[in-house]
Amino acid sequence: MIFDEDSSSVAQESGYMGVGSPYSSDVGRISMSDHWNKLTKPSSIKVVNHGNALNKADLIIEPLESGFALTLGNALRRVMMSSLRGFAVYGVEIENVLHEFTSISGVREDVTDILLNISMIRLKLSGMDNKVLSLKVKGPCEVRSGMIADTPDCTILNKDLLICTLDQDVDFNIKMYVNSGKGYVPAVKRKSINKFGLNDVPVNFIATNALYSPIKKASFRVESSRIGQFTDYDRLIMSVETDHSILPDEAVALAARILQDQFQQFINFDETDEPHQKVDTKDVLPYDSNLLRKVDELELSVRSYNCLKNDNITYIGDLVQKTESDMLRTPNFGRKSLNEINELLASMNLHLGMKIANWPPESIESLSKQYSEE
């Protein structure tokens, strides 16, 4: 598949200043770091579990720039499904069985069905990548994965899984070979003995399909989010179900880390060498620069802005020192306006009821002007 787009005009219009670009030496144009620093980043990631099931959860990420929820959601979902590592049975030895195209006396299922059931065993190893599990059962009975004894370094996660049914008074002895991997590896891909990681492959060794992925389901949906009165932002809701070997939020974090590692290879510049880089306001101003912004810069509704103006609240630094009770005592200021202001402050990592020493500063006008120039 070929994805192509003529983006030369887009690069010029956006002021892109890549390494070696003719725009990078233009002093009056956009700083390189503005391309990522000036984008809206999520102010919260909320994990909502499905009842008491710790392996099922929705992760709500907002606000995101328009279009970013689809981009990030698709990338995270694909990486979670394909690239997270887990453990699986990749081969077995069944007593008196030389290949999978046979049946066992006294066992209801044939060997092919038994192998299919074994491939669905979910387990977790601790401190090792390989292990051989043994199971010895005497019929008649149902053989389930929970009959494999837990050890300090191995935990069976789905103990009710049916492996086979012994209809007669027969012995069923099996060894299961476990290792770590990613994705799905069918038995037909394990043609080479070296791929098994075994020094001496038994004559009755039978390869099985191995599903290593710890993710059972992963999906996402995109909704609208808002900052103040602007609603053209995205909310990403990721629904993840795991096999209990990891938690849903851990799965998303691992997928993000994999993407971070892959994307790092595309960055061909050193941020510390950026030309004409201005000093960050936070390094030279005695206050958080957001506190020095005037409230009329915020995208507030007319009612909320007029309430602040009538209460002589000029700077955000004045606003955050008010408590919610103080604000609700302001004439014409209600819960809707309070929620609006709380959302805007949260997007700047601020909140009502803050204590700011030595506020307001004597030179607040000059400091505010310095911030606006930055």
From Swiss-Prot:
GO BP terms: DNA-templated transcription
Coiled coil regions, renumbered to chain: none
Pfam families membership: RNA_pol_A_bac (PF01000), RNA_pol_A_CTD (PF03118), RNA_pol_L (PF01193)
Ranges where the record places region Alpha N-terminal domain (alpha-NTD): 1-270
Gene3D superfamilies referenced in this protein's UniProt entry, alphabetically: 5' to 3' exonuclease, C-terminal subdomain, DNA-directed RNA polymerase, insert domain, RNA polymerase, RBP11-like subunit
Annotated catalysed reactions: RNA(n) + a ribonucleoside 5'-triphosphate = RNA(n+1) + diphosphate
EC number assigned by the record: 2.7.7.6
MF-aspect GO terms: DNA binding; DNA-directed RNA polymerase activity; protein dimerization activity
CDD domains, per database record: RNAP_alpha_NTD (cd06928)
One Gene Ontology CC term in the entry: cytoplasm
Record keywords, A-Z: DNA-directed RNA polymerase, Nucleotidyltransferase, Transcription, Transferase
Domain of life: Bacteria
Residue segments, region Alpha C-terminal domain (alpha-CTD): 282-374
Role, per record: DNA-dependent RNA polymerase catalyzes the transcription of DNA into RNA using the four ribonucleoside triphosphates as substrates.
Protein family per UniProt: Belongs to the RNA polymerase alpha chain family.
Quaternary data: Homodimer. The RNAP catalytic core consists of 2 alpha, 1 beta, 1 beta' and 1 omega subunit. When a sigma factor is associated with the core the holoenzyme is formed, which can initiate transcription.
Comment text on domains: The N-terminal domain is essential for RNAP assembly and basal transcription, whereas the C-terminal domain is involved in interaction with transcriptional regulators and with upstream promoter elements.
Name of this protein: DNA-directed RNA polymerase subunit alpha
Gene: rpoA
